[in-house]
């Protein structure tokens, strides 16, 4: 291959001084001829001897690399035009397991899309100047936290002409970033997978998207938008809700957070209790009027707490705890930055901090992961930390999170707590069951024998609708009872097995009060505020908070055989003031038994009831990951720089 350069014209600068119009026309004609003959490539030799290569196409003049037309779809991995051709925009290749795509290295876009940069400073134009920092490409940008992305856009460097073009685009981007900042999501990265978002985070993102629509006269319904928010972030969320209201909209919020309730104009309190004891409007009216009234005539428990007639009292004294502690050195993962953390044993320890400050990373990926590995007796190195000691004082670790108590509709509170095993034993011990030779398995809907085989003991039959969601219809053989007719003929105190499973926890506790093996388990469920659940309620219908409390209840009746480290993540989600009080009593009971409870929490009643606090921060995302305060609630309250 040979490069042949043909000289088209030579123009002296002096000609522009003598006859500028003629010189420009001559230059234009020369460029057009050169571009035509060279298929879009032209070289210009300057008076100082330097050469400059220009192209009329999307081709790099230096190495000849071609470039597609730059348009929005180039930066979308959902478009065949922009997706990496090797992995089709997935970022992984499925062989025996999902492996990172070797071409795009998991970035999901074609190489050309990654060569377009934005910068916060002026880039060198001369080709002789070395471009050590070209700025950020789209993958770099979406990998930023929302707060960092906003700072980048505020400092974006554009030429005068480009800035004029980009003004409306930059404004739309910054407005949307502001909306997410205003609802307390500054710590999230823009490329965060939707599947990894908590319910509260997903709800606040939907709320942020509504701020940009400018709707007027709309009704917004929100279900506990403050879930997972630190008290500091509540103010921004409340400000956002008030902004929507000022636009002329109506905001209906289901909420237990005190700050949000006090920001409301009108209060509707439903109760007085849960389940069969609820469903009644106990109090309603303008909030200021209800608070200013001389007496809480409605008897509303909510108003009683809001008027400070009832409150969660401070512990009389903080526990001294037991000898020994779990010491973790060099905890490093995500935004955790080489932190040393000490957890005293035999105490209620509360982990606090603003959203995204590293609390969950520490609890799940450092503390639980390594403790579980130690108790499993596996010889594996410490992960995400330099060292961890103190687990020798404990016998086991239990993570009580908000994951479902079962993966199928067959799981329910009775099966999870073990109460159903004793209930089946009770039915099989009846004279009628013994006369028929029936064992406990006859009263199980999980195995063949006594269950309805038409629906396999589900009570419903799934009808596949192909492109539509699956429809469930009541079984026409057992009419939803889940059992064969003969099985239901056996009763205990006038109730068959189906009728027992339809009882609420509260009803069943009274019904089985003379059977300790069953009553103890039901008492635990009742103590956690779950008296309204039915024994046979499907696990798939329980909220995350309810599932978590079922797990806590299952620990209360467990005999004390070894000291346990309990780890809880925001157990107060979805709880009323009164339920929070009950939860605190239960957690304190676990500690009184010699166990250690570590809980992530934003609820101030739980925080003030703790024996020891570990506060992460000071901010979320890259601005967090440090232990900024530790000690008793009184000691942490004196620490400057701690939002908690």
Where are the regions a protein language model picked out?
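Conserved phosphate-binding elements of NTP-dependent enzyme cores
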Residues: 1-644
